Amino acid sequence: MRRSSTALLAGHPNGENALVKPIVANGLRGYGRLMTLNDRSSALALLQTRRSGKPRELVAPGPTAQELDQILTIAMRTPDHGKLSPWRFVIVGPGQRQQLADLIARALPEHDPDATSAHYAKALEFAHQAPLMIVVVSAPIRDHKIPVWEQELSCGAVAMNLLHGANALGYVGGWITGWAAYSERVRSAFCGPRERIAGFIFLGMPANPLEERPRPLLSEIARDWQPPEND
């Protein structure tokens, strides 16, 4: 494997220490290489510089109704073994955010009986952040010959394509879950009996410049296959 010059970063999520490349991104010191994040100058540049935003820092404008249709159509162009479309999109409208906040507030004590007023305030913030909110639902066909695992992978690919579509139109997205995605009360408000929330995706424009985050070195995560020795 080819190696490249690196810096040592402590506390990387993939281990106590991880090797990353020092860079400056959007005028901020980060790790990687000199780049413009979400660079739309070409398809390749956009893929190479894709960066999520923090949902709480996404502000108006968000995608129009026509742009949302484009984004969801792009999202559906994903690998899908068996052509099962094992995913759904649920759009939470601007006028429904308070209803979502109320739903999460009712679910919070079920998740944390000791929840404080600060926890409730955070739940309220979650429901109202960013101009547009899409709930991606994993809806696998359980008794099909295509394994559920493969169908769930397709759902993850749909969510990633959704972010790519939003980025291509100049927006920034954030894909998160949190405890609410695993709350039965919240799940049942968006999903059928055997479906699950794959994520809450928030779209808008960044209120602050995006900052690059640590990325693993290719040499640390990719390797040439070594066939096993014959028994």
Placement of each model-derived feature along the sequence:
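N-terminal amphipathic, basic helical "cap/leader" segment at the start of enzyme domains
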Residues: 22-129, 229-231
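Short coil/turn connectors at secondary-structure junctions
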Residues: 129-132, 171, 194-197
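N-terminal amphipathic/basic-hydrophobic helices that include classical n-h-c signal peptides
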Residues: 1-34
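C-terminal helix-cap and adjacent tail motif
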Residues: 36-49, 196-231
